[in-house]
């Protein structure tokens, strides 16, 4: 457990309800299951002619993205809008941060605009925890991805994808393949899978892209793709994060694809009904063959759909937990 994850009680109110969503580490299985169940109920909203429920009417959700994103930012916007919240998205490239304003000052100024919730994506590990510790206690903080540390909503949408396609976790073999070292998605997935009872979690990649001590997550480590994929139910592919790499970790993308790219032939080693996932963006011909990404085993587009429902669940649950905490503190102050 990292020092960041040791701060996990910050996420819960006095009743054990979600008030911030910063990391999956340490969250009880019951709470993760509640998030999945709530998201399941929200999937129906997306099929309606009017895709809205009034749960966050009158609330303001501010998306503060210091890193580029398409799927995460857009699905958070849609999730908040479908909950009837007012939504602000900060364009960081034109914000005061480009003029030297600190992260803390930026959030303080946004807080003065009376936002009820911040969704924060940042290149630095721990940014979401820092904000949750220092902003007004009435404001809920949702981590949209921080450095290499965590991407909890991606982790949960991946769990929803697996549960909806496989029915549960208790008898599954799941392989996570690629750049494990730099992937916050891999960390969130390993934590969630273990908490939800998956008995066989595998990480597969070159030694240079496997974190030291990754076994502490309860995973089996493979450096041979064919061996690691044998009889798995779920394959989660990860992109090479060149922007986070330093030094010569890889000889070339072509060499990586030759050894670790998911092709139709290699997928044949998994179970016949295996599903293939990817958090995006996909690098075709680097970590995955187009025939696999677009094929019958792929549930990559389903992940995007489920992402809206998961983010609706997290936004609504965190706001409810904050409201309960506020009421508790007011009653005890009297």
From Swiss-Prot:
InterPro entries xrefs: Asp/Orn_carbamoyltranf_P-bd, Asp/Orn_carbamoylTrfase, Asp/Orn_carbamoylTrfase_sf, Asp_carbamoyltransf, Asp_carbamoyltransf_Asp/Orn-bd
Enzyme Commission designation: 2.1.3.2
Keyword Transferase: yes
GO molecular function ontology, one term from the record: amino acid binding
Keyword Transferase assigned: yes
Cystine bridges: none
Record pathway: Pyrimidine metabolism; UMP biosynthesis via de novo pathway; (S)-dihydroorotate from bicarbonate: step 2/3
Binding-site residues for carbamoyl phosphate, renumbered to this chain: 71-72, 121, 151, 154, 280-281
Keywords from the named record: Pyrimidine biosynthesis, Transferase
Cellular component annotations (GO), alphabetically ordered: cytosol
Residues annotated as binding L-aspartate: 99, 184, 239
Catalytic activity: carbamoyl phosphate + L-aspartate = N-carbamoyl-L-aspartate + phosphate + H(+)
One GO BP: 'de novo' pyrimidine nucleobase biosynthetic process
General function of this protein: Catalyzes the condensation of carbamoyl phosphate and aspartate to form carbamoyl aspartate and inorganic phosphate, the committed step in the de novo pyrimidine nucleotide biosynthesis pathway.
NCBIfam families, per the entry: asp_carb_tr, PRK00856.1
Protein name (record): Aspartate carbamoyltransferase catalytic subunit
Annotated source species: Pseudomonas syringae pv. tomato (strain ATCC BAA-871 / DC3000)
Gene this protein is translated from: pyrB
């Amino acid at each position: 457990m990292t020092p960041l994850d040791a701060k996990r009680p910050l996420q819960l109110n006095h009743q054990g309800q979600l008030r911030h969503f910063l990391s999956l580490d340490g969250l009880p299985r019951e709470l993760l299951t509640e998030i999945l169940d709530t998201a399941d109920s929200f999937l129906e909203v997306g099929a309606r002619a009017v895709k809205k429920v009034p749960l966050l009417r009158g609330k303001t959700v501010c998306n503060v993205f210091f890193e580029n994103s398409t799927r995460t930012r857009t699905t958070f916007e849609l999730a908040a809008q479908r909950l009837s919240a007012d939504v602000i998205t900060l364009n960081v490239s034109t914000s005061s941060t480009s003029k030297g304003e600190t992260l803390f000052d930026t959030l303080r100024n946004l807080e003065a605009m009376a936002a009820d919730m911040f969704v924060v994506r940042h290149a630095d590990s721990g940014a979401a925890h820092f904000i949750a510790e220092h902003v007004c206690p009435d404001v809920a903080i949702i981590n949209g991805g921080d450095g290499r540390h965590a991407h909890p909503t991606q982790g949960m949408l991946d769990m929803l994808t697996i549960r909806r396609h496989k029915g549960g976790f208790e008898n599954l073999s799941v392989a996570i393949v690629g750049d494990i070292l730099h992937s916050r998605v891999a960390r969130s997935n390993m934590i969630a899978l273990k908490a939800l009872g998956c008995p066989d979690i595998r990480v597969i990649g070159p030694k240079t892209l496997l974190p030291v001590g990754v076994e502490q997550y309860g995973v089996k480590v493979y450096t041979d793709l064919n061996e690691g994929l044998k009889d798995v139910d779920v394959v989660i592919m990860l992109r090479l994060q060149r922007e986070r790499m330093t030094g010569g970790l890889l000889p070339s993308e072509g060499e990586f694809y030759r050894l670790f790219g998911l092709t139709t032939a290699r997928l044949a080693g998994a179970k016949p009904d295996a599903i293939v996932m990817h958090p995006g963006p996909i690098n075709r011909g680097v970590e995955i063959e187009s025939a696999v990404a677009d094929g019958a085993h792929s549930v990559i587009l389903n992940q995007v759909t489920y992402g809206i429902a998961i983010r609706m669940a997290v936004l609504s649950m965190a706001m409810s937990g904050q409201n309960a905490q506020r009421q508790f503190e007011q009653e005890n102050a009297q």
